[in-house]
């Protein structure tokens, strides 16, 4: 990977992916793109940036040509909870952007990455230690988009030889960007509220287990997968990833190690709760481990320490 374009670069994953890729491959070799301008203090502003609507195919192709890209990391998407509120917008953005970026990868012979999600599973999926290959019948527009995306990526690999790669991300925890419309974002919000208010009201019920992972592990996983020799990848699209399976009470207890007076109560959002219940409690990540060495470094205690320290630092700087 020598010249990388990242779409959705101002999103939760995109922002940190841009930072890491610029550190690893050189600032001028990573073009960040998004549909809006970066905020004045955005870390993305330290290098090349273009406003890009991924549903505009001609503009996308033009951007690939002028930057002379060899890799496209497509992160632009409407997330799970937001997609349920705006299903037609979600279809147009998530599927239109996906097919356009896949076409760009085919036409210009790009290495290609896009994330899938645990949202690609549904209520008929085995809930504990969910296998890599299993039933996928999601009940949300976001999940339908993700399953379709996995199939399209595999189609472009088999039909056209495009070097497509993707992973099924769990909930991702980060202090760089605040919650952005995902079902698992309660966990991120709980950390911020613990520092700022000492209390959090969760919209997800206790004992609702979902897979999670610290963002640094997620970014490292993308880069590790993209740098792996193509011949070693048997699964290729939609690798299960997770670092931990947690529920709100577990997160509360981890926070109370540092904030003993932190309190948690519940005001359940039934729509988001139903979506959470349709997802696995835990997933099997053995394919990612065996094929390209997936090995997350952060568990719940280490993630909690890092998250709280980073948010405290932000508070002092405000």
Swiss-Prot record:
GO terms for biological process: threonine catabolic process. One of its GO terms (molecular function) is L-threonine 3-dehydrogenase activity. SUPFAM superfamilies: NAD(P)-binding Rossmann-fold domains. Signal peptide: none annotated. Belongs to the NAD(P)-dependent epimerase/dehydratase family. This is Uncharacterized epimerase/dehydratase SERP0194. It comes from Staphylococcus epidermidis (strain ATCC 35984 / DSM 28319 / BCRC 17069 / CCUG 31568 / BM 3577 / RP62A).
